[in-house]
């Protein structure tokens, strides 16, 4: 029954996670996508999920996941908080990277709601910008959506609203600077057919810049933007 539910979520266009069973385990290089391995230490990940079907046919998927490994941080010279000449942060380039997360997805039939929250530790530039250490991180998102089924010209239309926050090191950037993200998105996804879809989103965003240059790097940026996919 579980595998049939996972398959049905994908086949019906509800964006299920796929028919991978209730328990999964993986090993990967840990240096993020399209990056060569730099320390020969593999990340290990485990995930468990279960799709519960209510009497009315609506499905609620709940799950947990966790990973750990050693992440190799790249470094570049940066001006310390106290000012002066730019220096390369101290600390080992290889820092333990570990996270645990819990999530749920109430699939839109027609109303839906999903959320995820993550906690962990990973590399992060210190507040004085003189060293890179293992520090706490946390964040998550919540999204509400509606599934409108088309009779002509499309399969489904999904209007949605999403809010997300993250506080922690941005490990894939040089020096792993502390990253603060607060973002509200309004969007709509239009599925022409099973092979073609168009998504438009408008975001109100507050994010930390990755720019390490200048006397006052890693500034928080505020703005609004529109995205198409």
Give short role names for the model-derived ranges.
Residues 56-229:
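Outer-membrane beta-barrel pore domains
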Residues 1-65:
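Aromatic- and glycine-enriched pocket-lining scaffold segments that form the walls
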